[in-house]
Regions:
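Conserved "HGTGT" condensation-loop signature of ketosynthase/thiolase-family condensing enzymes
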Residues: 1-96
Length: 96
């Protein structure tokens, strides 16, 4: 569902997608803050971190998942989405 929403919103534009939680584990109440920090650091460094342990991505997830190694990608905007227990969800759009 998330991938479908990303594709509907962005059309043919396919930005690189990462998932910090694969590296950190679930940090419960701190997860959203840590993922937002990861997005800020990606903007600052120009590197999108690879998704750790993504060995067999879903073919139906039509996104540019960053795998195996970090990818250089100078960008001006990052989107950080967090989905919490009980439907407590948030999306942050961050810019340089």
């Amino acid at each position: 569902m998330l991938f479908r929403s990303i594709n509907m919103a962005l059309g043919s534009h396919r930005p690189p997608v990462t998932a910090p939680k694969a590296s950190t584990g679930h940090l419960l109440g701190a997860a959203g803050a840590v993922e937002a920090i990861a997005a800020v650091l990606a903007l600052k460094s120009g590197l999108v971190p690879a998704i750790r342990n993504l060995d067999d991505p879903d073919d139906q997830a039509d996104v540019d998942a960053v795998r195996l190694t970090n990818r250089g990608h100078p960008h001006e905007v990052a989107l950080s989405t967090s989905f919490g227990f009980g439907g407590h969800d948030v999306s942050l759009v961050l810019t340089r």
